[in-house]
Swiss-Prot record:
Name of the protein in question: Protein RecA
Pfam families, sorted: RecA (PF00154), RecA_C (PF21096)
Location of the region described as Disordered in the Swiss-Prot/TrEMBL record: 326-348
MF (Gene Ontology): ATP binding; ATP hydrolysis activity; ATP-dependent DNA damage sensor activity; damaged DNA binding; single-stranded DNA binding
Binding site for ATP: 64-71
Biased segments, Acidic residues type: 336-348
Positions with biased composition (Basic and acidic residues): 326-335
Matching SUPFAM superfamilies: P-loop containing nucleoside triphosphate hydrolases, RecA protein, C-terminal domain
Family statement drawn from the similarity comment of this UniProt entry: Belongs to the RecA family.
Gene Ontology BP term (one): DNA recombination
Major subcellular location class: cytoplasm
Functional note: Can catalyze the hydrolysis of ATP in the presence of single-stranded DNA, the ATP-dependent uptake of single-stranded DNA by duplex DNA, and the ATP-dependent hybridization of homologous single-stranded DNAs. It interacts with LexA causing its activation and leading to its autocatalytic cleavage.
Amino acid sequence: MNDRQAALDQALKQIEKQFGKGSIMKLGEHSDQNISTISSGSLALDIALGVGGYPRGRIIEVYGPESSGKTTVALHAIAEVQAQGGTAAFIDAEHALDPAYAKNLGVNIDELLLSQPDTGEQALEIAEALVRSGAVDMLVIDSVAALVPRAEIEGEMGDAHVGLQARLMSQALRKLSGVINKSKTIAIFINQIREKVGVMFGNPEITPGGRALKFYSTVRLEVRRAEQLKQGTDVMGNKTKIKVVKNKVAPPFRIAEVDIMYGEGISREGELVDMAAEVDVINKSGSWYSYKEERIGQGRENAKQYLKEHTDIRDEISKRVREEYEIDGTNKEPLDENEETLSLLDDE
């Protein structure tokens, strides 16, 4: 047994000498066993994710039909990162980012790094450079479907380019996955959906860009509109369902229901009323909502408005709900610079 241990120790020393300290270790000796997260900016989504937010150093895919709220979900996460003093980058391959809308959602557009690349290769090279810097906490690519390979852009309109985009994504993710994990960057890939022709049974919907992103993603979120939210005859927004279809860090298939209001994004008050009523932090009797035996509104919309006007009570309820769901922020790490991440460029 001693000979085997001595041989193992020798092998470990050789590996560390060749590949550097920390290249191999016992899992129990790893200092960062808990998954550190950054809030998604939505209480309901934080709860559905199971760990209180997006896991750092992982790849997230957000997909769904057009105008379902995919970019809104990503922008809320950027606002949350910036609120904690972190740096965020947005690679706008669709050339469709609305700065005014982003500002309404709480994004500091003066500090947001923005790139509008010409080709898919350029977009992914920029993404790699940003991640390797070790100084970017969140990177959003909008969208995978718009990452057009250079050969397709330079070719004729009717030319066939079978599998080019899938190969591009597969190669990029092979390069990015390791360095994303080391740098603790959250990489959010927004994706569209397409339909397979001739599918008789099962779901005909697929996401562009091949299968690689499905495999490399730690979390996959499906965003879909459920119903319109009306005030009288005016449509004010949409009730949206966000389904966690894949989750490597917590149980999957949980669903978050949020109100996405036009021009405002996710209504924090709306999801707070729903989640608080679910765990009896807010009491619902008939159509009346009450907190600590004090009525806060008749009907959901009035309760939302009350919380919007009384931010101290809203924050108190939010804290209690997070404690009930055991996502009180104990797994949050400060977004500060460290020697390990900032030396990623030097190691190459």
